UniProtKB/Swiss-Prot annotation:
Record-annotated membrane-spanning stretches: 19-39, 64-84
Main location: plastid
Family stated for the protein in its record: Belongs to the Ycf4 family.
Protein name: Photosystem I assembly protein Ycf4
Record organism: Oenothera elata subsp. hookeri
Annotated GO CC locations: chloroplast thylakoid membrane; photosystem I
Gene: ycf4
Keyword Signal part of the UniProt annotation: no
Function field: Seems to be required for the assembly of the photosystem I complex.
């Protein structure tokens, strides 16, 4: 979501609370839970899942391997659920022409550096840079080039913006900030 006025541009950034992350975390949890149940039922010799008979799967090596993959999947699923609940990567970009300040805020993982807050003067912005890599894994990222700081990404590489959308966004932001656009 973008909110703009004559002097201020605020863009809210969606972090890890995307529908795709919810779907992946849910599917991974169900799949790995199924693997753990099949491995456990082969160990106990009881049918915990009615789809597979425990006599068809021997505990060593199939049941053991399925249990291992199930436990690994549960760990990965719990990691995804934690990033969703902490909303890692969300935040905002705030460009204030009146005060001449740019603020970039993102939520990180819990700990000492949970809040990532960057603040720059607008006159330190050299350019808005578009990086485009075409091919099977196309990647289009928008950067803000800062004197002495390097390039700071403004969009995620997994946003999957079309070339037209990223060009439009770069042009609007460069016009608002009154800086040139570079394309790589």
């Amino acid at each position: 979501m973008i909110w703009r006025s004559e002097h201020i541009w605020i863009e809210l950034i969606v972090g890890s609370r995307k529908i795709s992350n919810f779907c992946w975390a849910f599917l991974l949890f169900l799949g790995s839970l199924g693997f753990v149940l099949v491995g456990t039922s082969s160990y106990l010799g009881k049918n915990l899942i009615s789809l597979v008979s425990s006599q068809q799967i021997h505990f060593f090596p199939q049941g053991l391997v399925m249990s291992f993959y199930g436990i690994a999947g549960l760990f990965i699923s719990s990691y995804l659920w934690c990033t969703i609940s902490w909303n890692v990567g969300s935040g905002y970009d705030r460009f204030d022409r009146k005060e001449g300040i740019v603020c970039i805020f993102r939520w990180g993982f819990p700990g000492k550096n949970r809040r990532i807050f960057l603040r720059f003067r607008m006159k330190d912005i050299q350019s808005i840079r578009i990086e485009v890599k075409e091919g099977i894994y196309a990647r289009r990222v928008l950067y803000m080039e800062i004197k002495g700081q390097g390039a700071i990404p403004l969009t995620r590489s997994d946003d999957n913006l079309t070339l037209r959308e990223i060009e439009q966004k770069a042009a609007e932001l460069a016009y608002f900030l009154r800086v040139p656009i570079e394309v790589f």
